[in-house]
C-alpha cells in the first residue's frame, strides 16, 4: 500500500469489533480526554516512538481526527514510517459520535 485508504465510520466499527485494526486518535489531549472511541491510542509526537515499537508494521492502522482532514496527512506519514495498511477515517470523531458510542471523560 503506497497510499492510505479512506474508511467509513461503519467499516471502522466493524474492523475494531473484529480486532482487525488499531485505532489512533490524533486530536489534542483535551479533546481526547473529553471523549474518544473505546480502544483508541492517543497518538502524539510524544507517543509516536512507543506506538511504532509496540505495533507490528503489518497491523492495519486507522487514523482518527476531528473531521477526517488532518488524519489524511497522519495516515500518509505512518505509511512512510513503514506501516503497510493505513486508513483515514472519513468524518473523524465528529461523524463517529453522532451515531456510535464513545468513552467520555466527563
UniProtKB/Swiss-Prot annotation:
It catalyses: thiosulfate + hydrogen cyanide = thiocyanate + sulfite + 2 H(+); thiosulfate + [thioredoxin]-dithiol = [thioredoxin]-disulfide + hydrogen sulfide + sulfite + 2 H(+). This is Thiosulfate sulfurtransferase GlpE. Keywords: Cytoplasm, Transferase. One of its GO terms (cellular component) is cytoplasm. Belongs to the GlpE family. SMART domains: RHOD. It is found in: Cytoplasm. It comes from Pseudoalteromonas atlantica (strain T6c / ATCC BAA-1087). Its main location: cytoplasm. Disulfide bonds: none annotated. It holds the Pfam family Rhodanese. The active site is at residue 65. Residues 17-104 form the Rhodanese domain. GO terms for biological process: glycerol metabolic process. Transferase that catalyzes the transfer of sulfur from thiosulfate to thiophilic acceptors such as cyanide or dithiols. May function in a CysM-independent thiosulfate assimilation pathway by catalyzing the conversion of thiosulfate to sulfite, which can then be used for L-cysteine biosynthesis. Its EC number is 2.8.1.1. InterPro entries: GlpE_sulfurtransferase (IPR050229), Rhodanese-like_dom (IPR001763), Rhodanese-like_dom_sf (IPR036873), Thiosulf_sulfurTrfase (IPR023695). GO terms for molecular function: thiosulfate-cyanide sulfurtransferase activity. It is an enzyme of class 2 (transferase).
Amino acid at each position: 500500500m503506497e497510499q492510505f485508504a479512506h474508511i467509513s465510520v461503519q467499516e471502522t466499527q466493524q474492523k475494531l469489533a473484529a480486532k482487525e485494526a488499531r485505532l489512533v486518535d490524533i486530536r489534542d489531549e483535551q479533546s481526547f480526554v473529553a471523549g474518544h472511541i473505546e480502544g483508541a491510542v492517543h497518538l502524539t509526537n510524544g507517543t509516536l516512538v512507543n506506538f511504532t515499537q509496540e505495533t507490528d508494521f503489518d497491523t492495519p492502522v486507522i487514523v482518527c481526527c476531528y473531521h477526517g482532514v488532518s488524519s489524511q496527512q497522519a495516515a500518509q506519514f505512518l505509511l512512510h514510517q513503514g506501516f503497510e495498511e493505513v486508513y483515514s477515517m472519513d468524518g473523524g470523531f465528529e461523524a463517529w459520535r453522532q451515531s456510535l458510542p464513545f468513552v467520555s471523560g466527563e
